[in-house]
């Protein structure tokens, strides 16, 4: 029993304490006899025109929360009319627990399905950072997303086996890797995904080494554009020239999406 839950304890660090959400608006979605908490916020351009042209379904890291970032991130998309839907995983913030890896994939799909009902045909871009990239890739493999943004994507099984297996002769790493849910298989989901994708890759990532990013990039089955985050570590925010590149790349992503739909 303990070994079966070991990946949850090693990877997920949920918090429940209230966080100031700025101007973000809280909503909930029914999920597995409980609720999934989502925080929404619009960019200035979306507010000015009375609605968004693009929706960004946002998934965060293994110790992070949507209520911390949704409003702040909406402000950074100054060139686009967007609405952020930031998802708190089960067990995080106001989302019903428990926090389990096996619940992340289904929760991500439930959030997408709710957003799709709201979006009215407008494009939905799934954006995930760190473990959030595994959720975004799962959605892209299961649903018709308009595009993907993947920030330091981790191939969890491969990391456990290759980075931690040697010191225990794979006696612990092997069983732990097998406990990673198939929904969060970044390599398999990358191969199955066809939406245009933007990869944001920190070249000094100390948590998900760049060689592991590359496994996901190389497996990805759709059109892709890479943005190198030079000198950046795993949790460094996107800013400066990289933020300008991301805004430009979103325009490319949307054009690719339109081309594929013709």
Where are these regions (language model features)?
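Short alpha-helix in the alpha/beta-hydrolase fold that links the catalytic acid
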Residues: 72, 185-186, 195, 209-218
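C-terminal catalytic histidine-bearing segment of alpha/beta-hydrolase fold enzymes
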Residues: 214-262
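Short beta-strand/loop motif that positions the catalytic acidic residue
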Residues: 192-194, 198-201, 205
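Membrane-embedded segments
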Residues: 36-114, 122, 134
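Hydrolase active-site cap/lid region
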Residues: 138-189, 195, 238-239
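An N-terminal hydrophobic leader/cap segment in hydrolases
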Residues: 1-31, 35-44
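Acidic catalytic loop of the alpha/beta-hydrolase fold
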Residues: 203-208, 235-236
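Alpha/beta-hydrolase fold nucleophile elbow
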Residues: 119-130
């Amino acid at each position: 029993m303990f070994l079966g839950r070991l990946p949850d304890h090693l990877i997920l660090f949920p918090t429940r304490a209230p966080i100031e959400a700025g101007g973000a608006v809280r909503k909930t979605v029914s999920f597995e006899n409980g609720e999934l908490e989502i925080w929404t916020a619009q960019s200035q351009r979306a507010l000015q025109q009375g609605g968004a042209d693009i929706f960004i379904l946002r998934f965060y890291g293994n110790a992070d929360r949507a209520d911390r970032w949704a409003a702040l991130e909406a402000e950074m998309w100054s060139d686009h009319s967007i609405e952020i839907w930031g998802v708190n995983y089960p067990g995080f913030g106001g989302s019903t627990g428990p926090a389990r890896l096996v619940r992340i994939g289904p929760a991500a799909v439930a959030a997408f399905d709710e957003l799709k009902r709201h979006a009215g045909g407008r494009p939905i871009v799934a954006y995930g950072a760190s473990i959030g990239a595994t959720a975004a890739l799962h959605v892209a493999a299961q649903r018709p997303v308009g595009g993907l943004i993947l920030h330091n994507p981790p191939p969890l099984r491969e990391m456990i086996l290759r980075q931690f297996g040697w010191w225990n002769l794979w006696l612990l790493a092997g069983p732990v890797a097998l406990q990673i849910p198939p929904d969060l298989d970044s390599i398999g989901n990358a191969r199955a995904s066809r939406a245009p994708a933007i990869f944001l890759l920190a070249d000094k990532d100390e948590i998900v080494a760049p060689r592991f990013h590359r496994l996901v990039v190389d497996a990805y089955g759709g059109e892709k554009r890479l943005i190198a985050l030079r000198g950046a570590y795993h949790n460094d925010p996107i800013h400066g020239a990289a933020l300008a590149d991301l805004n430009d790349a979103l325009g490319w992503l949307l054009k690719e999406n339109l081309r594929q739909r013709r």
